[in-house]
């Protein structure tokens, strides 16, 4: 369908009716009659050659086609409304401050940012990185991307992606590792969690490392993988965040066994109101990750 044939009034009527699941409430919101909403929806259904609503025992319901169309319109109208508001207040740039755990920033977010800037040029994005210990209120952050179980005090958290952990090491060390037990011939590199290696060894069917085993602790998986590339030992880290190193063969994943100790989440303090820019960023990021 070309732009000249896009039925904007019918789409507005459908979006309001679908959001409220009521033609009456949609008519009140748009300041038109119930009959006008009904006619616009009927016209849109004829143009799309499909039914968008059905009437059930509990009232108006969306069809599968209606459910597919609604989020697209929600996003489009939100973006248009947000831009018009910014022009009206002479603020064409909306600032957005994000704190991102370094591993996710390098392994996932940074490669995607050019797409975000193309799609949302009106958002002035400020990014700071952290090592999963962060104070969003003190730092004035709109969103914080964290690793963990999804529960933080007075915080809303939305799931982004998994962070399955597995051993990673240099090709030189990998050539000397035939079984999981062979990993214990080398220093073990880990983050602040003491039980990572014990849990992975258990999943691989091996005994945990000795309490006296040579272990190096890092506050960032990024610096830990730098050490692993240099042959300083075998790291345990979220594989998904280091696909760029795996594809270039700078590091190797010697075994497919993985453990689930946490995931990545986008979080917001409940005391912080959600702005249009925040909603746009969250919707964009979850969209690209969940494709």
Swiss-Prot record:
Signal peptide: none annotated. Keywords: Activator, Cytoplasm, DNA-binding, Transcription, Transcription regulation. The keyword Nuclease does not apply. Residues 23-42 bind DNA. Its main location: cytoplasm. Regulates the expression of the beta-lactamase gene. Represses cephalosporinase (AmpC) in the presence of beta-lactams and induces it in the absence of them. This is HTH-type transcriptional activator AmpR. Residues 6-63 form the HTH lysR-type domain. Belongs to the LysR transcriptional regulatory family.
